[in-house]
């Protein structure tokens, strides 16, 4: 089998919490060597819980596989020297401190660039390096300031956050794309560059059609529950037993839906002839659909609608979602190759490469688990450079 696509790249991971670690875990899955630098107390998320497994936070375990951990106190001169040695030998450095923090230790991009011109240096912040550099930022704050909460929830009077730190995850993915792009360019020029990612810009980009409605049409979107601002029926609906999701994107699908529900005439109703009309008349549309859906349970409607190609599905909880993915043969849970049956149980990467698949080599590291080995390894690298 061919080596992993990012082997043997070395990533100096100075990141913490979620956005940075999600990025570096993705790079590690693709074969990069990840050295995670932690302060003496460890990554903040090591203490975030419950739940815990064997006294380890599942939050931390979920985004730190395929990494080695070294504890460094950057206020200590020797530890700072080790950190700088790591940065000078790395192909990639990822950090998500508030802008200016790395510069206080001489670990900022300009300081490292002189001795490592090929370094791809990635900085992730909440609000960017300019006017927002002093603003503290967690995902929730960005969801609020970035507009996501205003379009999420039952109505505009009940702003609601997403059920996961979605902006952090998206920032990690955008950082990964930026890093891979910079590495590709480095193959041509031999030069590294600075990749800057901020959560605010990530969210505005990820709002996609909602952002476009404001930028292009000067319309300010609002929350409409589980519905879609531009498509109907595209929502959750009550049935005789349980809820069902309908995602009807075409007039043909709407006609099929009405046929299956036994209300074929609804498709010819002047209020519902086109998607635009259905969006304008979503309230009476819901009333008619739920009246028909009440005749049977959600399981029945999902089965018969799916059979004719109308997008429909149950509203699963997380356990049901994993079970469904397993039924589809997607292997949603993997075990790391180190044989740790508890801490090594991992959510599968969604990246599937035919020739160079992702790997699940090791569980998330214990705090400082590899400190001695990494120090010795870096000392040898440094000695080799000085004698070269």
Q: What is the meaning of each model-derived region?
A:
Residues 172-192, 205-217, 258-265:
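Oxidoreductase and adenylate-handling cofactor-binding alpha/beta cores
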Residues 1-10, 222, 238-239, 320-388:
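Terminal low-complexity tails and localization/encapsulation signals of metabolic enzymes
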Residues 41, 126-128, 199-204, 241-243, ...:
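Glycine-rich beta-alpha junction loops
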Residues 34, 306-320, 381-384:
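Short, well-structured beta-strand/strand-turn elements
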Residues 156-164, 187-203, 222-229, 270-273:
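Conserved Rossmann-fold dehydrogenase catalytic segment
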Residues 1-188, 362, 366, 370-388:
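N-terminal helix-loop segment corresponding to the beta1-alpha1 unit
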Residues 219-234, 295:
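Active-site Gly/Thr loop motif
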Residues 232-308, 312, 388:
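Aromatic-enriched alpha-helical interface/lid elements that frame and gate functional surfaces
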């Amino acid at each position: 089998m061919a080596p992993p696509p990012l082997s043997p790249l070395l990533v100096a991971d100075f990141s913490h919490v979620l956005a940075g670690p999600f990025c570096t875990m993705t790079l590690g899955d693709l074969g990069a060597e990840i050295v995670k630098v932690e302060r003496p107390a460890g990554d903040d998320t090591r203490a975030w819980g419950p739940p815990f497994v064997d006294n380890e936070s599942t939050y931390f375990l979920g985004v730190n596989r395929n990494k080695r951990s070294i504890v460094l106190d950057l206020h200590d001169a020797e530890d700072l020297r080790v950190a700088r040695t790591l940065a000078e030998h790395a192909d990639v450095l990822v950090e998500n401190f508030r802008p200016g923090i790395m510069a206080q230790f001489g670990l900022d991009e300009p300081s490292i660039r002189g001795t490592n011109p090929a370094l791809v240096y990635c900085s992730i912040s909440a609000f960017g390096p300019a006017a927002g550099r002093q603003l503290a930022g967690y995902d929730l704050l960005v969801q609020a300031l970035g507009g996501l909460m205003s379009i999420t929830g039952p109505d505009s009077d009940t702003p609601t956050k997403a059920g996961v730190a979605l902006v952090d995850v998206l920032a990690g993915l955008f950082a990964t794309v930026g890093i891979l792009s910079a590495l590709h360019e480095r193959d041509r020029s031999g030069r590294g560059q600075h990749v800057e990612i901020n959560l605010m810009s990530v969210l505005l980009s990820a709002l996609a059609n909602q952002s476009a409605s404001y930028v292009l049409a000067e319309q300010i979107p609002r929350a409409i529950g589980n519905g879609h601002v531009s498509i109907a029926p595209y929502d959750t609906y009550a049935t005789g037993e349980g809820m069902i999701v309908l995602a009807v994107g075409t007039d043909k699908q709407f006609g099929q839906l009405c046929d299956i529900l036994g209300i074929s005439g609804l498709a010819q109703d002047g209020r519902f002839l086109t998607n635009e009309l259905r969006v304008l008349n979503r309230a009476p549309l819901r009333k008619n659909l739920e009246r028909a859906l009440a005749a049977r349970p959600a399981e029945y409607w999902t089965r018969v609608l799916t059979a004719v190609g109308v997008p429909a599905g149950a509203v699963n909880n997380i356990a049901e979602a994993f079970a469904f993915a397993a039924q589809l043969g997607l292997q949603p849970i993997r075990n790391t190759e180190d044989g740790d049956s508890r801490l090594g149980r991992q959510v599968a990467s969604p990246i599937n490469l035919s020739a160079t698949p992702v790997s699940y080599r090791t569980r998330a590291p214990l705090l400082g688990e590899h400190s001695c080995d990494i120090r010795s390894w870096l000392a040898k690298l440094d000695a080799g450079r000085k004698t070269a």
